[in-house]
Amino acid sequence: YIGFHICEFLELKRLPYFGIDNFSRSHSKNIINKKKFLKTDINSKIISSLVSSKKIHTVIHAAALSFPPESEKNKKIYFENNIKKTKTFIDVCVKNNIKKFIFLSSSNVYNFNPNNIKAASESQKNKPSNYYGKTKSIIEKYVKNKFEICYILRLFNIAGYINKKEF
């Protein structure tokens, strides 16, 4: 969902990009420019050659399973996707000298009560209240140790109107 909107923005601004998605929880029919997309998983063996051949210098990582209640029931699947595959992808980026890495994390790294939300601060220690938040927290630490230039965006719930598109 978020990755789609990032690509849509880049396409409309005519900025260069290339997207990767396994479409396990989205539809490829929404892709604006199918020539700039590859249907594969982030731990696929072809990612390394793709990254080196495209001369990529910045990566925006938006791939994750992202439903906190589901993460509590399916920890193995969330570990495999959000931690193991993501670490493999990050290591490929490091190996291919990616200069900038933008990781879309989550407000779920904070431990807060949704009924009593206080302002979250970046100086707070990560204390995830669910397994999804824990996977994001683990990768935040991993990213910080791998890239000289990295940005971590702790997004809160994102939703909005999209005309005639299904996700």
Regions found by a protein language model. Give the residues of each.
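Conserved catalytic-core motifs of eukaryotic protein kinase domains, centered on the activation segment
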Residues: K29-I31, P69-I77, F112-K118, K164
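NAD(P)H-binding glycine-rich loop region in Rossmannoid oxidoreductase-like domains
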Residues: N43-N81
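Short alpha-helix in the Rossmann-fold core of NAD(P)-dependent oxidoreductases
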Residues: A64, F79-T86, I102-S105, T135-K136
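Conserved sequence/active-site signature of Rossmann-fold short-chain dehydrogenase/reductase
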Residues: S66, V109-Y110, I158-G160
